[in-house]
Curated annotation (Swiss-Prot):
Gene name as annotated: lipB
Range of residues in the leader sequence: none
Organism: Citrifermentans bemidjiense (strain ATCC BAA-1014 / DSM 16622 / JCM 12645 / Bem) (Geobacter bemidjiensis)
UniProt GO BP: protein modification process
GO MF: lipoyl(octanoyl) transferase activity
Gene3D superfamilies reported for this sequence: Bira Bifunctional Protein, Domain 2
Misc remark: In the reaction, the free carboxyl group of octanoic acid is attached via an amide linkage to the epsilon-amino group of a specific lysine residue of lipoyl domains of lipoate-dependent enzymes.
Protein name per its UniProtKB record: Octanoyltransferase
Role of this protein: Catalyzes the transfer of endogenously produced octanoic acid from octanoyl-acyl-carrier-protein onto the lipoyl domains of lipoate-dependent enzymes. Lipoyl-ACP can also act as a substrate although octanoyl-ACP is likely to be the physiological substrate.
Domain of life: Bacteria
Length: 204
């Protein structure tokens, strides 16, 4: 698996890189994990409800992923796994549950207890939503992925119903731990832990 850290990047450029990697995996290339922070941007999934955008001046980017409207910005670790799911079971639901499990175990390693919510995709603590998940698939190659709140400014979330959930509180690892964490620290943890857990739960 290729691990590609592209730093802080605009959404359009990240999408271009994803599409390039997807094409390479479709042609038999190595799977990849894209690690980054986005410049501030709001995105909305293909089936998302525009009514969940509370600020009438806000124009979210419509993207080919599941889920509703969300915010990405500095202080949030975004990971886009580019995986050949045709060789990992062809089960999108199982893949989503794997991403949730990975996030729960990753956060537990930092001393943050979190959980999933039946009927919802993502990860929560008792204080609010900690990570969002939205994926897309092209010919069984995955794109998009998850966003983990490490230490972002949570104020921009007030302009939307995050993930289509009115009144949804947003938390972060830094808020949960009472100390500032940095995205680069989490990138190292993800790079170490992602592939072994992936091969355990979604073996090729």
């Amino acid at each position: 698996m290729i691990f590609k850290d592209v730093g802080v990047i605009g959404y359009a450029e990240a999408l271009r890189i994803q599409e390039q990697l997807v094409a390479e995996v479709q042609q038999g290339g190595e799977e990849a994990l894209l690690l980054l922070e986005h410049l501030p941007v709001y995105t909305i999934g293909a089936g998302g409800d525009r009514g969940n955008v509370l600020d009438p001046e806000l124009e979210p980017v419509r993207v080919n992923r599941g889920g509703d409207v969300t915010y990405h910005g500095p202080g949030q670790l975004v990971c886009y796994p580019i995986l050949d799911l045709s060789r990992r079971g062809r089960d999108l639901h199982r893949y989503l549950r794997f991403l949730e499990r990975f996030l729960v175990e990753l956060c537990a390693g930092l001393g943050v207890g979190c959980h999933t919510v039946p009927g919802r995709t993502g990860v929560w603590t008792g204080n609010g939503k900690l990570a969002s998940i939205g994926v897309g698939v092209r010919r069984w190659v995955s794109m998009h992925g998850f966003a983990l709140n490490v230490s972002p400014d949570t104020a921009p979330f007030s302009r939307i119903n995050p993930c289509g959930m009115p009144g949804c509180s947003i938390t972060s690892l830094s808020l949960e731990l009472g100390e500032e964490l940095f995205v680069d620290e989490l990138k190292e943890m993800v790079a170490i832990r992602f592939q072994p857990l992936l091969n355990l739960h979604l073996p090729r």
